[in-house]
Each structure stands twice: as structure tokens, then as C-alpha cells.
């Protein structure tokens, strides 16, 4: 399975848009984030802390920071023994509150800065609040998960060939949280830079990765039988995608109109 995964990454890496994103992801390490996210503590040249960038990143202290750190206790217990040992080699240094993307507006998102063998050995963990699934209102008969952070973490592990070794969950303040590394080897592709063959290649890669993820988390034979050998499934996806794009443009125009009207 690992050999298949390595081959897949190598093959997809030959696609120009993906190759550029992979190069960027290779540089997205904790050591690289150290200079971006932290600063030297004034008067203490050997110590570092989060570098505030309000409102995007704000340091958290006192009882709030203590609550976040305390929540790591239950998180450690759910990690595999080797991961738990690795985490024990790091100590928490600072905590910050991070403004998250549009899909998580209004949710709590914390970052914890750890140090291992000094400032040159950093680790950044993200503790992100996870609400109920967006599907839950439409699935009244489904058994609700006991923990939304666990739901997301186990879903990622099921769909990804290799997931974040520090992926896990915790709870505090009556809320469920997902725990993962912050920006560890993450990369993205700017769609504005794509056109023609590049855009088609990118769409093909996205479709393949989505299909592989579903095949890993479900029964691939059942999925293949449901899809069949004809063009019906592909045509249905294309129709849905076009309708979704139209709805997105409509929503965006209504949002702009509301903004101009002061609503």
C-alpha cells in the first residue's frame, strides 16, 4: 500500500500545478513556521513566544491558556504509545487564538507552541473546535457521534493514505476539539494561475484523490457497481458542479447587494 502511495505522489507530482504545490508543501515545516509565527521575548534572547498579528493571531494567557494546556491530558491518552512518547519530549511554551477560515467562522481555534530541544526544535499544534456535522439536520435517524473531534479525526484517517501522526481530539469548556499539527507540509494551488491543460489536469487530480478517499473509507466494489461502466455518473457530477457554481455566483451577488444596502 505504501509503495502504491509513493507511486501516486510521484506520478501526480509530474502535473505542473501539483508539482508547484508539492514544492511549497515541502517547506511548510515547524521550523519554517517558527520565524513566521514567533518572536524573541524582549529581554530574553533565548526565549520565544507567538508573534501577535491582531486580529488574526492573538496570544492567550492566564486561565484561558491553562484550560487549553490542561486539555492536552486527555489528548495524550488517545495517541498511540510511540506518538505519546514523542509528544512527551516537547513542553508547551505559549498559546494563541487564531482566526479561522470562512467555513469555521465563530468557532474557537487555538495554537500551541511547543519546544523540544530548545527553540530550534519547535512543534505547533492546532486545537480546533468541531461542531456537529452539517449533515446532522438531514439525518434524523443517524446515531450522533459521542465526540465531534473524534468523528473528524477518524474520518480523515479512514480516507487518507497517511494522516498527521499527531491527529487526535480533546474536550474542554463543554466543546469538542480536533487536534492536529499546524500547517505541517500543507500546500495549495491558486486556481487563478490555471488555464487550459493545467486546469484540466488539476480537475483530474482532484477527482482521482476524491475517488481514492471514498474507496478507502467504504467498499470499493460496491462503489464501482453503483457507478457502473457508463457515463451517467460522470454526467451527473458535471451537472451538479455546474449548478453548484451557478448557485455560488448567485449567493455572492446577493451578498454584495446586501453589503451595499447596509444589511
Sequence positions of predicted segments:
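Contiguous mid-protein beta-loop-alpha structural module that forms a pocket-lining wall or clamp
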Residues: 1-61
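Ordered core of a single globular domain
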Residues: 40-93
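Conserved ATP-binding subdomain of kinase catalytic cores across diverse folds
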Residues: 1-28, 75-263
